[in-house]
Amino acid sequence: MARPQPCGPPHARCGSPSLPERPLQVKVVGLFSCPNFQIAKSAAENLKNNHPSKFEDPILVPLQEFAWHQYLQEKKRELKNETWEYSSSVISFVNGQFLGDALDLQKWAHEVWDIVDIKPSALYDALTEDFSAKFLRDTKHDFVFLDICIDSSPIGRLIFELYCDVCPKTCKNFQVLCTGKAGFSQRGIRLHYKNSIFHRIVQNGWIQGGDIVYGKGDNGESIYGPTFEDENFSVPHNKRGVLGMANKGRHSNGSQFYITLQATPYLDRKFVAFGQLIEGTEVLKQLELVPTQNERPIHMCRITDSGDPYA
C-alpha cells in the first residue's frame, strides 16, 4: 500500500530537498510467528547497518497473536482512515509516521536507500521458526491450550501464557488440570478440564468455566485438595484476556477460572490473576457472543481437549 513516505538522502526523490536533521528511526511491530515480521525486521536492520549515521537503532516489537490484534485495533482507532482496512501481520513507522506493512518498508528501503533484499522465502520461514522458539523460551513461562466447541461445532483453540514466576502454585494447578496428569482426587473427581464447560458469560465482564465436578458452577477441585489459598494479587485485571481463578471468597480457589472480556479493575485484590490469553482472538469473540439466560449460555460451550500446546 502506497503511503506518504519519510524523506531519504539528497539524491532520492522526496517531498523535501534535504535530509531531516535528526536520524531516522524505524519501528516495526508485528506478529512474532509470521515471516513478515522477519522481513520487516531485516529491512529495518539493513537500513541501520548500511546507513549508520542516518538511522538510529530500530525499535522491534514482536507480539503474540492476541496482543497483536489488540494493538492493531488501538492503532486503527488512533490513525483512523489511514489504517481502517489494514489487515497485515506487521506494521512499520519511520520517526512515528505510518509507513505500511513489511513489503512497504522493503520497497522504501530499496527505492530510497538502495537496499535490496535477496533472501529467499525459505530462509525467512527458518528465521521465523528459530525466532519463535527463542521468543517463547525467553519468557520462562509455561503455556497451555483449551480446544473449544459450541454445541458440537469446534471453534478453535485458546492458548494461555502462565506467569509461573509470579504465581507458581496457582499456575501449576491450572497447568496440571489442563494436562490431566494428576489423575483423580481423593474423592474421585477427575482432575482434568477436558469435557468440562463454560457455565457463565458475563457481558462486558468475563467468561467462566472449570467446574470439573458437575459443571453447574457451584463446585470444583484443585490438585491440592478441594481448595487452596490466594497466592498473591500481583497480576492486575487491566485488559482483555486476563486469566484468573474464580472463588467463593478468600482462599477458596479450586478449578474454576475466568477470562476477562475487558479491563476489570474491580476484580483486583479479590481474585488471583495468573495468566494471559496469547492466541485465540476469534475464539474468545465467539464465546463472548453466545446468547445467555441469567448469564448461563443457552448453547453448550465445552472444552474438548486441553494440555501443553508445544509438547
UniProtKB/Swiss-Prot annotation:
PPIase cyclophilin-type domain: residues covered: 145-308
Coiled coil spans: none
Entry-linked InterPro entries: Cyclophilin-like_dom_sf, Cyclophilin-type_PPIase_dom
Top-level division of the source organism's lineage: Eukaryota
Pfam families, sorted: Pro_isomerase
Gene Ontology annotations for the cellular component aspect, listed alphabetically: cytoplasm
PANTHER family: PEPTIDYL-PROLYL CIS-TRANS ISOMERASE, PEPTIDYL-PROLYL CIS-TRANS ISOMERASE D-RELATED
UniProt family annotation: Belongs to the cyclophilin-type PPIase family.
Function, in words: Probable inactive PPIase with no peptidyl-prolyl cis-trans isomerase activity.
Protein name, entry field: Probable inactive peptidyl-prolyl cis-trans isomerase-like 6
Species, as recorded: Homo sapiens (Human)
